[in-house]
Amino acid sequence: MNANLELLSDLVHHMKYAKYLPDKNRRETFKETVDRNKQMHQNRYPDLADEIDSAYQFVYEKKVIPSMRSMQFAGTAIDVNPTRMFNCSYLPVVDWLAFSETMFLLLSGAGVGYSVQKHHVDQLPEIRKPIKSRRYLIQDSIEGWADAIKMLMRAYFDGRPLPLFDYRAIREKGARLVISGGKAPGPEPLKKAINQIQSMFDGKKDGDKMTPLECHDMMCIIADAVLAGGIRRSALISLFSISDEGMMKCKTAYDVVEEEILSTHDGVYNIRLSVWRDGQYCKTQDVFLDKDSYQAMQETGKMEWYYFYPERARSNNSIVIARPLITKELFETKWDVIKNSGSGEPGLYFTNSIELGSNPCCEISLNPYQFCNLTSINVSNLESQEDLNERAKVAAFIGTLQASYTDFHYLRNQWKKQTEKEALLGVSLTGIASIDESDFDFAESAKCSVEENVRIAKILGINPAKRVTCIKPEGTGSLVLGTSSGIHAWHNDFYNRRLRVGKNEAIYKYLLENVPEVVEDEVFGDGAVITVPVKAPDRAKIRTEDVEQFLNRIKHFTKTWVQSGHNGGMNTHNVSATVSIRQDDWSRVSTWLWDNQDAFNGLSFLPYDTGTYVQAPFEDIDKTRYEEFSKRVQRINLEDVLEIEDNTNLQGELACSGGECEVY
């Protein structure tokens, strides 16, 4: 790893995963974070202390990395709430407890996949509006927030008294969170979510049923409250029926039927808009538009969905496509919707059973009420097949340790039962774009992971994993390792990589004093932007590659790595990927997808972005600019960054659909 990537690695670890050490007035070093993670397992399994120590040498050397959730929360936070060990979860919305459990899971830091397929949502009871009411004091905890949602659902689905929520026990905004780290969000995010959901219920009549779109919106509102609480961003995937037009269109523009200009100032319009879809009234909303946006609305008669339902941005949405039932004609119809959306949504989720689901990034195949943990292998600096095999064993060893933390609380019993039954692993690869995959036998290394899982599972007294290998998008984890993201190509031969930072954070002040060249004020905000120049390895794959080359790489690793680690279940795990499609390539991609349905489960799609904008997360630069900038970049000692109080941002690794959306 060169000096620039080392700096980027240090910064991301410090900002996202390092625990605050109050006795030292600083955050952990990478070694201290790994020490804490390793010690957690050694405390639980003292007889394996030596083996654990040997395995973690690969982590210190950044050849393998555990679950980033476990790196973040290792110790008391996981002891208190083992849900924090797991990256991935899935549940169908067949019971109103799904909403409170989702609040609990998201607040615990897990990504949540959920199904609002029609046959699932139809199982919810009819609305029974509450007649009586009673005061309800919300407790200041993850469980307390989840219970507040549970009480609200119980009132409208079970006819119980309507809770009059009392928020006074919730700590004020900015109070320190001792166990998990970071700052308390205060009661406002929860209060806003409860009011929004209650308003939705109040718009229904006794005996009405909730629609899939309404259930989806409630999930997104819950996720919005969690984001405002600083835990995690975009941590949902919503799976919906192929015939559901409401879900299909929920992230498309609305028809404007009435507008009233309330005020104008310096070219900004404050307008009250009423919007319709398919001839039915949807919503009236006050919005602020600049001159260009106002003129565009006048010309098209439409306004984008996010002005009216911004919470829908919290979820990635995917059509559930049953492989045994889909026809080419129906597939092409849905593909045209994705192409014409301009945003690549919804995504596609091919499955052998509509009862199975996935996590937000779609690399894990999950049964209802099931968790999976993740580990990653850095393949960018492999020395030999033996080296790869050894890393595969270590990643499976650590993943199997992680899989044993199933002493869940709060959740229904089926979560523990289903998770223990299949004891899933998600052993991933990252840095693939730096190597020639034909130099290695990934099927052989996948078998090494499977065999090691069987060995250590027997020692721990848990079941061997039904599914072991996957490829996840790798988000900020790849930055910590200094690699390209999962299966994805490097951005370019030379580029600037940007991270945002608050000016109240100690790291900002330290960088400003020691390496001011990498810090600048944020143009469209009150924070700052850190810029680090990056050089892709020689002969690395970069994002200008042909789209079929990328798709065939996905297919290759599905066949060799993922399927070789499959021991059971109707779906294998998956290669998580976002496919960027040039204007002339949509037809080619459609043909490839139809012809290669067995080479993927879920994929996300985006129009290929050739544009530039100020302070973009990735910015192409040439070799001269890279070399000039690099001369001014130096390694820094983050132990010198002193913090009088904990300003940790718990958003950590974002639960996103691809490898290039983790910056902000």
Where are the regions that the model predicts?
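Extended catalytic cores of very large enzyme megasubunits
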Residues: 1-664
